[in-house]
């Protein structure tokens, strides 16, 4: 049994989640690959039903409670929001977490980055620049990603390094998002952004792997999400 555990990379002494009874994913471990479907799923396979296929033109609305806490430490002060976005967009490099929540986490990371505020220099650790953001609330997201799986109230933590041009440092993110089944109205997720930080919303969203389109009404809709190597794209801004 011990040999089998070694092969599978299991550890018997890992702490278990009190709520789910399973060991939490190793969010900070390095891995040589990300998990993603390599081909379309055949409808005849087990568990595949109509929720796995969708009309890309069908508009859906996802209403949720969310919380995002972000800390960014850098070796030097950021000059523009483009510098911030280039760094923070690395948060899900080599992502290991709940796959169904990743598109929503991308939005929360984008949201948090627009609300970052610098810590007074006298309070910064060893004099290095620090930035913090804490956003929470209720919101709905218009999207064309098809039917999404149920989302539970389980926080996830991510810590990643970044090295973009002149900037080096770390990003720490704690995010929670779960279904809001109430009948109360909620604002769009985009209303929680600090839009004064930038004007080119579509371009900045793309740095986080978010493909958004503007409707005739002026509202933004999430069309799709990309999980490719956004580091090279982000570093070009």
From Swiss-Prot:
SUPFAM superfamilies: VSV matrix protein (SSF75404). One of its GO terms (biological process) is viral budding via host ESCRT complex. The gene is M. This is Matrix protein. It comes from Vesicular stomatitis Indiana virus (strain Glasgow). VSV is used as an oncolytic agent for cancer therapy, because of his wide host range, rapid replication and mild pathogenicity in humans. VSV used are mutated at M51R in their matrix protein. These mutated viruses cannot successfully infect normal cells, being unable to counteract the antiviral state induced by interferon-alpha in normal cells. Cancer cells are impeded with responsiveness to interferon, and then can be successfully infected and lysed by the virus. It comes from the Viruses. It is a peripheral membrane protein. InterPro entries: Vesiculo_matrix (IPR009397), VSV_matrix_sf (IPR036711). Homomultimer. Interacts with viral nucleocapsid; this interaction contributes to the virion assembly. Interacts with the viral envelope glycoprotein; this interaction contributes to the virion assembly. Interacts with host RAE1-NUP98 complex. Interacts with host NEDD4 and TSG101. Interacts with host dynamin. Interacts with host NDUFAF4; the interaction inhibits viral propagation and is independent of interferon activation. Interacts with host GTF2H5; the interaction may inhibit host transcription. A motif (dynamin binding) lies at residues 2-4. It holds the Pfam family Vesiculo_matrix. Residues 1-10 have a biased composition (Low complexity). It is found in: Virion; Host endomembrane system; Host nucleus membrane; Host nucleus. Phosphorylated by host. Late-budding domains (L domains) are short sequence motifs essential for viral particle budding. They recruit proteins of the host ESCRT machinery (Endosomal Sorting Complex Required for Transport) or ESCRT-associated proteins. M contains two overlapping L domains: a PPXY motif which interacts with the WW domain 3 of NEDD4 and a PTAP/PSAP motif, which interacts with the UEV domain of TSG101.
């Amino acid at each position: 049994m011990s040999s089998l555990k070694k092969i599978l990379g299991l550890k018997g002494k890992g702490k278990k989640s009190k709520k789910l009874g399973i060991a939490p994913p190793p969010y900070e471990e390095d891995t040589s690959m990300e998990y993603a479907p390599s081909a379309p799923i055949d409808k005849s396979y087990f568990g595949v039903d109509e929720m796995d296929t969708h009309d890309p033109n069908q508009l859906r609305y996802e209403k949720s409670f969310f919380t995002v806490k972000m800390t960014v430490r850098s070796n030097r002060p950021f000059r523009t929001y483009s510098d911030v976005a280039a760094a923070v967009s690395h948060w899900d490099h080599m992502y290991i977490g709940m796959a169904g929540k990743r598109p929503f986490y991308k939005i929360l990371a984008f949201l948090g980055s627009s609300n970052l505020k610098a810590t007074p220099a006298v309070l910064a650790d060893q004099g290095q620049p620090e930035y913090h953001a804490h956003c929470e609330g209720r919101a709905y997201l218009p999207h064309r990603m098809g039917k999404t799986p149920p989302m539970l109230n389980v926080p996830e933590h991510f810590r990643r390094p970044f090295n973009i041009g002149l900037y080096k440092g770390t990003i720490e993110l704690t995010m929670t998002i779960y279904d809001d089944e109430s009948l109360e109205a909620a604002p769009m997720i985009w209303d929680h952004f600090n839009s004064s930080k930038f004007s080119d919303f579509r371009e900045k969203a793309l740095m986080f792997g978010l493909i958004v389109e503007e409707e005739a009404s002026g509202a933004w809709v999430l069309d799709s999400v990309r999980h490719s190597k956004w580091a090279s794209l982000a570093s070009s801004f």
